[in-house]
A protein has these predicted regions:
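Bacterial N-terminal signal peptides that target proteins for export
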Residues: 1-9, 19
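C-terminal segment of classical bacterial N-terminal signal peptides
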Residues: 15-23
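Early extracytoplasmic/lumenal segment of secretory-pathway proteins
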Residues: 24-102, 112-113, 219
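Solvent-exposed loop/turn segments at secondary-structure junctions
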Residues: 39-42, 72-75, 93-97, 131-134, ...
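Alpha-to-beta junction loops
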Residues: 82-88, 146-148, 209-218
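A conserved helix-loop-strand patch within extracytoplasmic ligand-binding domains
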Residues: 100-173
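Ligand-binding pocket segment of bilobal, Venus flytrap-like solute-binding proteins
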Residues: 174-241
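Extracellular/periplasmic juxtamembrane helices and adjacent flexible linkers that interface
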Residues: 256-336
Length: 336
């Protein structure tokens, strides 16, 4: 069953100020839950306040948004196992598909919102200590014997899967597709990993607060937040090749239909594409999907970095099966 396309309908209803008649809108307050991945805490803390004002202005109703954060794969599993989410805003398409496979999201969710339901993007960079004492410039520096690496566990973290694939893309180019050499490179990289945290924020804590390692492989936004908070302690290195990381959003159909929150949940995700929210994303160091607004942040982001995409890996289903499923390449190289 194809997913009901309500975005335009909701927008037109709100724009025309048509009287709200549904039972849930008739109440003074509505509550929804956004189950998200690890490093979106600051983004949604700011966005939820803005959205509440928008919803109140358009409908007269107050909305309270409860947040849940953790490693993206773990969060998807929690929702599939019963954590009630009106919306999911996860690190990658595959994790939303896992919720769909559990029967909670209808087919066609990726076409529900613009840009394949990805309102903002990011990429993968290195966070190093001020002065870059180990001289880290590119992925090959991460396999040196004296370099301690921090990155999350790709079995539980969406960001960690983007990290792994970005490293693979670099090795693929360096070794002209020689899979044995690529695997050896990835094996050496993960041999240097000091701790595999379950999520990106945990990895940041290990590196920034606990002082572990020489380099953190990180979401771009997470690295910028660390530099913002500790400008005298850290700096960012952008590798020669990285990956276009595309977080995905979706309404959890089974939950909103049960609670009667489809309208507010849909508008919650739809409003992520508004100019106001696109700038909130940029201010929180996510790359806005709106190209014109992205250009406003040209002094913040390296817009010329060489980015591969998940399509270069055959899409998420193939990438997951090849690299991250039980017995996949990651298990093979990490357990050796």
């Amino acid at each position: 069953m194809k997913k009901r396309l309500l975005v335009l309908g909701i927008a037109s209803i709100l724009g025309a100020n048509i009287a709200v008649t549904s039972a849930v809108w008739a109440e003074d307050k509505v509550e929804i839950t956004n189950v998200s991945y690890d490093p979106t805490r600051e983004l949604y803390e700011q966005y939820n306040k803005v959205f509440a004002e928008h919803w109140k202005e358009e409908t007269g109703q107050e909305v309270e948004v409860t947040q849940s954060h953790g490693g993206s794969g773990k969060q998807a599993l929690e929702v599939a196992n019963g954590l009630e989410a009106d919306v999911v805003t996860l690190a990658l398409e595959y994790d939303v598909n896992a919720v769909e496979d559990a029967g909670l999201i209808e087919d066609g969710w990726i076409d529900e919102f613009p840009n394949d339901s990805s309102p903002y993007t990011s990429t993968i960079v290195f966070l190093v200590r001020k002065g870059n004492p180990k001289g880290i410039k590119n992925w090959d520096d991460l396999i040196k014997e004296d370099v301690g690496v921090i990155t999350p566990n790709p079995k539980t973290s969406g960001g960690a899967r983007w990290n792994y694939l970005a490293a693979w893309a670099y090795a693929d180019k360096q070794f002209n597709g020689d899979e044995d050499k690529i695997k050896d490179f990835i094996k050496k990289l993960y041999a240097n990993v000091l701790v595999l945290d379950s999520g990106a924020r945990g990895a940041t804590t290990s590196f920034v607060e606990n002082g572990q390692g020489d380099v953190l492989i990180a979401w771009e936004n997470e690295a910028y937040l660390s530099v913002q908070d500790y400008p005298d302690d850290y700096e960012i290195v952008t590798p020669s090749i990285s990956i276009l990381a595309q977080p995905s959003v979706a309404v959890v159909d089974s939950v909103v239909d049960k609670k009667g929150t489809r309208d507010v949940a849909t508008e919650y995700l739809n409003y992520l594409y508004s100019d106001e929210e696109q700038r909130i994303a940029g201010d929180n160091y996510y790359r806005p999907s709106n190209e014109d607004i992205l250009k406003e942040y040209a002094d913040t982001f390296d817009l010329d970095v060489n980015l591969v995409t998940i399509d270069d890996f055959g899409g998420w289903d193939k990438a997951q099966e090849t690299h991250f499923a039980d017995g996949g390449v990651f298990d093979q190289i990490y357990e050796e």
